[in-house]
A protein has these predicted regions:
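Extracytoplasmic "Venus flytrap"
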Residues: 26-48, 78, 141-144
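Pocket-lining segment of extracytoplasmic ligand-binding domains
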Residues: 173-273
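N-terminal export signals
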Residues: 6-22
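Short, well-ordered beta-strand elements
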Residues: 23-38, 59-64, 134-137, 166
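Flexible hinge/capping segments at coil-to-helix
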Residues: 120-136, 227-232
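Conserved C-terminal helix/tail region of periplasmic/extracytoplasmic solute-binding proteins
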Residues: 307-362
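Secondary-structure end/capping motifs
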Residues: 230-325
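Short helix-initiation/N-cap motifs at beta->coil->alpha
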Residues: 63-74, 163-176, 180, 191
Length: 362
């Protein structure tokens, strides 16, 4: 469990018991970024006492660092966390193979596609189609990079049977693997790629396949029973998260300040504040917009999903995961739920934007 003062406990130290403090329900989140820094400000800024978005809803958040979405799935299954990010390409096969896995996607927190294809500047890879038969770097073997590659190649009528997926980690190790030609491409999230650039590795970004580029990247999944039993807490959680996301998008520097005030141990010790701020702006240069819905999205509600996008994910996953009966095994109407979304969006968005623009930590 990662509290605001202690980032040292392992997942194995957790117990599956609800946490309460002065009438506030503390909900544990699987942090698949694997690092607790201001990248999480789109959630954590609302914990600042001047904002108190979570306490106003009688909830709070604790982070549990994970190495992958696969680990987050396992932690949800064993009730070690209350909610966690989930990619359709990982969630759908799990639901098909384990019918008793009663998870539901309730909040789309990355409504744009935050996946990227990175190569060395001089690489011959110019499009997603060129990934076929190549050595693909991924953060680890449980990372969505594998599913993402399979999905794009399937869209383009290609197979990945000759691709080699190589775990290269994050940051410096990933950069070294790219620089030393251990992999031909790195398929990862926007923030992970930015961290590789920060260690000095030069990258060129290759466009995603057209259809895949139009879908969201990640949802938050919760156990269905927990959703039923603690519905009010989850509404409050996601409303506070929506407010925090809008706040961070409206004033990223203020969100950094709020995050560092709440989690002072996460502030880099080897950098000046200006250096830390500049670095974090670079990490979130693309992610900042991926938090928000596209302007042409007909549903502008924070967290909303659509039946059409989940049916599309099922169709693609059936092919990439070699599960031809997936549409029969997983009901698209049940894998996600918008039941909380109207209540989640019941807040004054202009007031949050104004609050962000005028925010001072002290």
């Amino acid at each position: 469990m990662l509290t605001r003062r202690d980032f040292g406990l392992s997942v194995g130290a957790l117990v599956a018991v609800p946490a309460f403090a002065q009438g506030v329900k503390v909900l544990k989140v699987a942090n698949t970024a694997g690092v607790m820094d201001a990248q999480q400000c789109f959630v954590t800024c609302g914990q600042h006492p001047k904002l108190n978005f979570y306490k106003q809803e009688s909830v709070d958040v604790e982070y549990v660092n994970m190495t992958s979405i696969t680990q987050a799935l396992q932690s949800l299954m064993t009730n070690q966390v209350h909610f966690g990010p989930m990619a359709p390409g990982i969630l759908l096969p799990a639901l098909a193979r384990e019918p008793s896995l009663d998870l539901v996607a309730v909040y789309e927190w990355l409504p744009r596609n935050a996946n990227v294809i990175c190569v060395k500047p001089g690489s011959a890879i110019k499009s997603a189609a060129d990934l076929a038969g190549k050595r693909i770097g991924v953060r680890n073997q449980g990372d969505p990079g594998i599913v993402v590659t399979k999905t794009m190649l399937a869209e383009l009528g290609l197979k990945d049977d000759k691709c080699e997926y190589i775990a290269i980690g994050d940051g410096l190790p990933a950069g070294a693997a790219i620089d030393n030609d251990r992999v031909d491409a790195f398929v990862t999230f926007d923030t992970a790629a930015a961290r590789v650039e920060l260690v000095g590795t030069k990258l060129r970004y290759v466009p995603l396949s057209p259809k895949f580029n139009q879908v969201g990247s990640s949802w938050i999944a919760v156990p269905r029973k927990a959703l039923k039993d603690d519905r009010k807490a989850y509404v409050g959680l996601f409303r506070a998260m929506a407010k925090s996301t809008l706040f961070a998008h409206s004033n990223l520097d203020a969100a950094f300040d709020a995050h560092w005030a709440v989690y002072p141990e996460s502030k880099p010790k080897s950098k000046t504040e200006d250096e830390a701020r500049k670095e974090m702006r670079f990490i979130l240069k693309d992610r900042k917009e991926n938090w928000m819905r596209r302007a042409d999205d007909p549903d502008q509600r924070f967290g909303a999903s659509s039946l059409a996008e989940w049916k599309a994910h099922i169709d693609v996953t059936a092919e990439t995961a070699k599960l031809p009966d997936l549409a029969k095994q997983v009901d698209a109407n049940k894998v996600f739920s918008n039941e909380l979304i109207d209540e989640v969006n019941q807040f004054d968005k202009e007031a949050i934007i104004a609050m962000a623009k005028g925010f001072k930590v002290s």
